[in-house]
């Protein structure tokens, strides 16, 4: 069965922003290769202006976020939904709910609505108490107005089952292992030096960037610490100002060249992953696929992916201890190998696309059967 599928809730593809854009890029192209007609909604501000990408139809909708800030996200999602109502999609896949679930009453009436439930957005410390309360409400609305649900983490799946008594489908993100060509392109001279630590994240408090850099700053390490991520926001400016006296810390900004990012991950002595909120994080999977040795913030999300194949820290003191004491020996090599095995057999993109396709087909069949039985269609 070939379906008409609309993917909403992202800023658009190809990815220039984050996790949902990343997975939408892979899943949409993968579904097209399997014969489905897929449309992805893009912000009109997206740098990719064509109406087609790798067989995926691109629909640009007006997005005033650049004019009015966060409120613009709600307007953008409303515009996407209003257009989707005209398209006669068999399935609408909503990537997240923070600014779309308030429009639940205008979700396309005859489409099967599937929502990827994101990663406990209301826990993010960057939000005020009022915003956190709204996000809890938005989560509740997403449960109410969706027919089916996807969780990208078993932790999220368990939370939704306990909180709302709903059964969501676990489908994680994916990552690609090195191709032979990519492996040949790695800078082996730099790899042999292994003279730097690495962190890649959005500059947000819940990513524990301050604790990581504070721990490194207080250490006696002679290595450099490279930080990848846009430092243009308020927190990013605070972080760069706080640590600008440490010549070992290098803020590299955002790097969108995936080959370069993967080489940096692969060549690092130790890769720090500080994310503490959310489901399966794409940058963590990419670090695993890039064969980096990983030190992760100690929380259920990271442990559900890495289990015993990483070092863990909870605060700056823990970071300092890792910076000063981690050695690259046989046990560490086994950690890297085990994580690569997880990418190959658990978090590979073909398996992820398989999961999305089979779940979408199952949901469409089930809902239409129910509608026939109840006389709704």
Protein language model features and the residues they cover:
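N-terminal strand-loop element at the rim of the active site
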Residues: 2-3, 10-16, 30-68, 155-157, ...
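Conserved donor-binding/catalytic core segment of Leloir-type glycosyltransferases
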Residues: 6, 188-207, 213-220, 225-226
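Glycosyltransferase donor-sugar binding loop
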Residues: 46, 200, 223-237, 250-255
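An aromatic- and histidine-rich active-site surface loop
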Residues: 72-85, 89-117, 279
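Membrane-proximal helix-turn-helix segments that form the acceptor-binding/catalytic region
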Residues: 82-85, 131-149, 158
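Short hydrophobic beta-strand element within catalytic cores of glycosyltransferases
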Residues: 270, 289-296
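Aromatic "clamp/platform" in nucleotide-sugar-dependent glycosyltransferases that forms part
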Residues: 275-276
């Amino acid at each position: 069965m070939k379906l008409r599928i609309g993917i909403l809730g992202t800023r658009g593809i190809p990815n220039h922003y984050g996790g949902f854009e990343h997975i939408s890029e892979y899943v949409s192209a993968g579904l097209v290769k399997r014969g489905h007609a897929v449309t992805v909604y893009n912000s009109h501000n997206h740098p990719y202006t064509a109406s087609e990408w790798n067989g995926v139809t691109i629909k640009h909708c007006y997005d005033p976020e650049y004019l009015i800030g966060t409120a613009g996200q709600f307007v953008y999602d409303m515009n996407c939904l209003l257009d989707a109502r005209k398209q006669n999609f068999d399935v609408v896949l909503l990537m997240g709910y923070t600014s779309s679930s308030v429009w639940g009453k205008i979700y396309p009436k005859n489409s099967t609505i599937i929502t990827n439930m994101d990663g406990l957005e209301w826990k993010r410390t960057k939000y005020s108490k009022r915003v956190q309360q709204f996000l809890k409400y938005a989560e509740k609305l997403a449960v109410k107005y969706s027919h089916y649900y996807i969780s990208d983490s078993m932790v999220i799946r368990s939370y939704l089952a306990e909180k709302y008594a709903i059964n969501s489908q676990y489908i994680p993100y994916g990552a690609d292992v090195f191709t032979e060509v990519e492996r040949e392109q790695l800078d082996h001279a730099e790899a042999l030096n292994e003279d730097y630590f690495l962190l890649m994240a959005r500059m947000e408090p819940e990513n524990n960037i301050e604790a990581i850099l504070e721990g490194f700053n207080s250490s006696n390490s002679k290595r450099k610490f490279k930080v990848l991520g846009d430092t243009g926001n308020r927190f990013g400016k605070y972080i760069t100002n706080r640590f600008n006296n440490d010549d070992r810390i290098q803020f590299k900004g955002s790097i969108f060249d995936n080959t370069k990012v993967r080489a940096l991950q692969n060549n690092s002595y130790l890769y720090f992953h500080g994310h503490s909120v959310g489901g399966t994080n794409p940058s963590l999977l990419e670090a695993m696929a890039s064969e980096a040795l990983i030190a992760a913030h100690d929380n259920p999300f990271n442990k559900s992916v890495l289990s015993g194949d990483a070092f863990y820290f909870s605060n700056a003191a823990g970071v300092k201890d890792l910076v000063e004491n981690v050695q690259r020996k046989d046990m560490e090599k086994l950690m890297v190998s085990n994580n690569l095995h997880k990418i190959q057999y658990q978090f590979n993109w073909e398996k992820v696309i398989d999961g999305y396709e089979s779940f979408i087909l199952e949901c469409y069949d089930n809902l239409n059967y129910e509608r026939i039985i109840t006389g709704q269609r």
